[in-house]
């Protein structure tokens, strides 16, 4: 067989294998988004269920950023359970992850979720001025992220 034929085959295999890595990462986050849409209404009605399901899915994901989106979903469920200490721990874990990573649109989206949650917690504590500052930061991060529609 000619060398050109094998070069084409090898090149095609490289392109396919690189494409799958991107697809796997996308699928992990896509799975999170689908789960989030399914349980969004349950957050206020049945936060214990959301906590249990989010914890199960956290252990199954292989993408770090997706893992911390699950952590933030867990924080929301804790907030609805009025477990503000656990919510704060989750927010701090996600914040530490963001600080360790280079700024990207995905990290900006995660920061937006963190500051939005902090704003919600502060608003529940009647700390309105501090909540407004957090909501403003959340908006700034959201505009730098991929998920502007959220």
PLM features: what roles do these ranges have?
Residues 1-5:
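Positively charged n-region of N-terminal signal peptides that target proteins for export
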Residues 6-14:
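Bacterial N-terminal signal peptides
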Residues 18-150:
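A "functional boundary" signal
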């Amino acid at each position: 067989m000619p060398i050109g034929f094998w070069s084409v085959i090898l090149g095609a295999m490289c392109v396919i294998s690189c494409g799958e890595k991107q697809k796997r990462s996308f699928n992990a986050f896509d799975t999170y988004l689908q789960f989030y849409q399914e349980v969004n209404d349950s957050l206020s009605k049945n936060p214990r269920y959301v906590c249990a399901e989010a914890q199960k899915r956290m252990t199954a994901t292989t993408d770090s950023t997706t893992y911390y989106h699950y952590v933030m979903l867990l924080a929301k469920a804790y907030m609805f359970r009025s477990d503000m200490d656990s919510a704060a721990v989750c927010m701090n874990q996600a914040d530490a992850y963001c600080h360790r990573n280079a700024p990207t649109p995905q990290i900006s989206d995660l920061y937006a979720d963190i500051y939005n949650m902090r704003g919600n917690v502060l608003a529940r504590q009647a700390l309105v001025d501090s909540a407004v500052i957090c909501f403003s930061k959340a908006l700034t991060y959201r505009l730098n992220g991929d998920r502007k529609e959220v």
